[in-house]
Amino acid sequence: MGVARRLASILRRHRRIALDASVFIYQLEANPKYLPQTKTIFSWLELPESSAATSTITMTELLVMPYRERDAQLVDDFNGLLSTYPNLDWIPPSLEIADLAARIRALHGLKTPDALQAATAVNAQATAFITNDKVFERINAFDTLLLDRLL
């Protein structure tokens, strides 16, 4: 079974997934190593039965490079592209998420941005978290799907 078919099968088994910033970065950069996976994920996001979430922290991470390079067009392109997926919820930090992130950080030793991503996934009731960072495997509240393992 090919990478795309295997990943599509995995996605269908989860009622809601959460996405780390790396998924968006690889897609927007058209990273050749991960493009089959990210294309599958973003195609899946267009299906009516899909449901996904990410923290607005993701947008912060994505926009650093275009702002650093003073590329207003790329900022607009990112904002336009990323806000158009119908089944992707952009979840801002709340006091509840901040509290959960602090607990995750204390228990699992994650850095604050990662703890916020994990807390957002838990708060959004995601059953899987797609990333390329092994640190998320410390958290048992969801299945961590590493893009490197989906090659």
Which residue ranges define each predicted feature?
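Short acidic, glycine/proline-enriched helix-loop-strand junctions
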Residues: F78-L100, A106-L107, P113, E137-L151
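Glycine-centered loop/turn motif at secondary-structure junctions
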Residues: P48-E49, Q125, N140
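Active-site neighborhoods of divalent-metal-dependent phosphate/nucleic-acid chemistry enzymes
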Residues: G2-L11, K39, L88-I130
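Short, flexible helix/strand-to-coil boundary loops that buttress conserved ligand/catalytic motifs
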Residues: L28, P66, R105, N140
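Alpha-helix capping/helix-boundary segments
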Residues: V23, T58, I97, Q117, ...
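Short, well-structured N-terminal submotif of metal-dependent ribonuclease cores
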Residues: M1-T54, Y67-D76, G80, K134, ...
